[in-house]
Structure formats: structure tokens, C-alpha cells
């Protein structure tokens, strides 16, 4: 495989450099140096060869600004054999029959920076061995005839980075074995030393993700606490703010129902032992908003064409949210002051959306001091903003969106809803696997999903009413397994349980009683086995067998208009499973039957039956 490996540098000018552009190539046992007469050189040094090859790439005396380093670059046979694994959020597998051919696919490797080709007959493994904070991704291209795949592992270039480390090699082709290769290497080469989960967040047994006014949000949480007196509950509160959701950011303050009522609600929750954090966006400023002229242009990312990098998330107000560069000090200071104000209201922590979801955007804002097209500033700048918050509010936990290896030392936790509930996004080609928990379990808090007992997405009363769905159906009957499988994934993956949109009607109506029973059962199970499911160590899941079932999912999010909603059907194992070892060395097989029928299972010589919509732990 090593003889197939190449590299490529892409420059700000659009020029690319490959080995063919260097007239001199000097080789010895573990090093290869490509040189030009002007002193420009690229060096690749091999550090290890087992279980995979580990190389370092160095760039010296470059004649122009480099945007990214691509190493390794390789073309391999593909066909119908391989699925693709990559470290976005928790971890994603794209099945062979869902891969888009004839186009360049780009994915961010912000979680565990692993990319692999999987098959039962062996596969190919790649990773980005971060020894310092840096952004990574991968471009891959499967030919239209599917015979080959070209892979380019991307390392964002920065003069502050000494070497670009990467690994590659053949391996078993199992996703967990890919996780174990990286996990074993990372044990010996820590990015951050002595990382431990936040002492407050690690105790949480259930997150309630509610949106809206106090009367809708708070009473059901208090009722859940009565049902789960021995469990630690947390409220992740959205739409508390005096602006429409995904509009007029970052002007969240004051609270929608007034500061006094907001403080009273937070105090009531705290008095009942409930952890409270609220939503703010940690990255965006509304380009079409009232306060844009107060520092938006000075803070934002600009693309190569001179346009503000933005996304129109809100399909109703149709405002564009601009992405702020890590160098955007006006924005950063504004966010620090907002967090301080919210903390003074009694909040136990703060959620800042999108921060760990970023890190791969090139910024060309001419007002900024960083090099044009720099990516490293996104990571360094947002880490600096979190450091400012920690300096002014010591011990105050900040959480954000999506697993991010480069934020393990600064963020106390992350939501994982975009992968664990990816069907809501209408992405039927994604299969989630717990790659990040397999590597970093117990070192950070992971929570979140889109699991709703009703299937009805919440509606912000500050949006235009004409865009609201005029009729709703009994979605929980049309998609009877969706809530249960999404909730079960949390437990089996070792993710803190989460329920969404738990409002008074959901807490009271008989039609949702089975889902409420399942919620209580899942939280009590997680609490009972927390020594495995939070503090434990994930082991290989290989050897498990059960039947498969077809599961229908409702592909709908809050901005999905009725004509865009769709049903996604997947063939999935009827029983979810994982294997864990606690700190005492005890091993357990963890099972979740999310279906409405009894199921039969077997695992490496053990077998049994599991009741409908239940959890079990089998000692190994």
C-alpha cells in the first residue's frame, strides 16, 4: 500500500503541488525528501509501521501561501465491496449502495479523525494523528463505474503547525477495529493531558430538550423529577429569548417573558435539583438583522468571492445567519458578556450552538490579520473565546454541538443529535456508529437526540403563522418505532438519555403513556449501569446476532415544510447492543429491544429472549 501513497499541496493562487513538481527526490530507510532549486521542499518521515504506517509530512520554504496539505493521497479498487466509515460527530457509515458516484464527496473529520473502507474481507484505514489542535477532512471520489475510489486526507495548513501527521494501512475492515487502532495510539499520544468529564455534567441521567414559554417548558420537567427522584435531570431550554429562533442573532437578551419571570423559573428548577442551561448560538450573526452594523462585517468570515459566509437556516423569516471568524473579537466579546449575564440569572451552564461543528472554513476577510484563507483561526479563535468565559466564570460548563476532538479540553459536553437522529434530516444514507464514544468515553459528556413522543416539531410563535402546518396526524402511530429506537441508541452508545418536546400535553395524555413508561425505564436502566455506560470502556460488539426489521422514520425538522417531509425506511437489527467493561473489570452485554414484539438474540455462545421495548444487561 505504501508505494501507492502520494501527497498534494493546494495554494491560495489555485495552483497545486505534487511530487512531479520537484526535480529531486532523496530517499533513505524511513525518509523521503522532494526538493526544488529555490529551497522549497516536502519531507515525509515514517515514525512507525505497526499496526499501520504512521508518517509525518513537513513543508519548508514554500514560495506562496498554502491552504491545505493533502496526505495521504491514494487511489484504490472499490466495487461493490466496501462501505465507508468517517469520524463526523459520533461516527458515520455510508453503505456501499448509498454512495454517490462520479462526484467529489467532502466530509469533516472533526470528531475522531478516522476514515476507513470497511468489508468483512478486510479494509483500508486512514487517520489524522493530531498532536496539536488542527482541522481535518477528506475528499473522496468513487468513479461512476464504481471500480475505484480516490482518497485525499486533508490537513488545514498553518505556519503554526510543525508537521502533518497521518496514518494508513490495511486492517480487519471492522468499524470497531478502526476505533481501536486510533484509541490505542491516542492512549500513548494524548492531545490534551488528564481530560475528565465535568464533575456536574457527568452526574446527569436525563436531558429534557424543551422549547418555548415557561408554562410549557418547566412544569413537565418538575413532574419528571417526581417520577425519577433518584436521577439527576437537566433542562436544555430553547426559545427563552426575545427574538425568533434562527433570526436576529446574537441579540438573545432579554428573556421573552421578562427577566424577573426568567430568574424565578431558573430558581424553581434549581431548587428542585435540576441543572439548567439555555440556548444561544456561539457562531452566527444575522446578516439581515438589526445589529449587523454593530460589528458583524468586522467579525464575519468572507469567502473567496468576497461574500459573507452564511446559511439561511430559517425558511420562514428567511434571514441569513453569517458565520463569525475566530478572529472576530467584537463578536467574541459580545458572546462573553451575554454568557456572564445569563450565568448571573442562576444558570448552571451554557449551551453555545455550532462551535465544535466548525473548524474547516477558509476566511478571506480583508479586515482580519490572519493569512487569507486561514482555517486554523477558526479553532484557535473559538477556543480563545471559551477560555475567556472560563477566565471570567471559573468552573462554568460550556456545551456545544457535535463531537469535536479539538475542543475536548474546553467544552464540557456536546450534543450528538445530528448523527444519533440523522433520519430526521432526511439523510437515509447515514448509519450511525459510536466511534467517538469508543475512543473518548467518560472523558466528555455526550447527550441529545431528536426523539419526540409525538413526532410534531415545535413551533416558535414569533415565526410567520402562515408557514405553520395546518394539520397534524398521529405521527407516533404512523411511525411507531421511531421514538423508541432513537432513545435506545443513546443508552446503547453510552450517551446520556434525552427526550425532546416533553410538554404538558405529552406528560398528561394517555396516548403517550407507553412512551413515558419507556422513558422512565430507559433512564432508570442508564442510572443503574452508569459504571458501564458512562464510566466504562467500550469493547468489541462483534459476534451478535438477531433478526432484522424494517423501521419507518419521519424525515422532518422544525424548518421542514409539509411538501418536503418524507418517510425513510431502513432495515435494521431488531435489538441494539453494545459491550462494556467497568473499572472493576466486569464485562456486560447491553441490549435494547425497541420493537413491540419479543426478540431472540445470540452472542458468542450466549443466547436469550428480550421483552418488547425493554433493556437488559447480560454479564459476560
PLM segments and residue spans:
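Carbohydrate-recognition beta-sandwich/jelly-roll modules
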Residues: 1-234, 239, 254-256, 268, ...
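Active-site-proximal substrate-binding groove within the catalytic cores of carbohydrate-active enzymes
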Residues: 156-165, 375-605, 614-617
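Aromatic- and glycine-enriched glycan-recognition loops and surfaces
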Residues: 204-303, 330-334, 377-387
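Beta-sheet entry/capping signal
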Residues: 231-235, 273-277, 348-350, 395-398, ...
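Polysaccharide-binding and catalytic clefts of secreted carbohydrate-active enzymes
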Residues: 238-250, 310-406, 472-480, 486
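Short secondary-structure boundary/capping segments
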Residues: 250-253, 293-294, 365-369, 413-418
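Active-site-adjacent "subsite" loops/lids of carbohydrate-active enzymes
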Residues: 257-261, 267, 275-345, 422-445
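Short, solvent-exposed loop/turn and secondary-structure capping segments
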Residues: 287-291, 362, 501-502
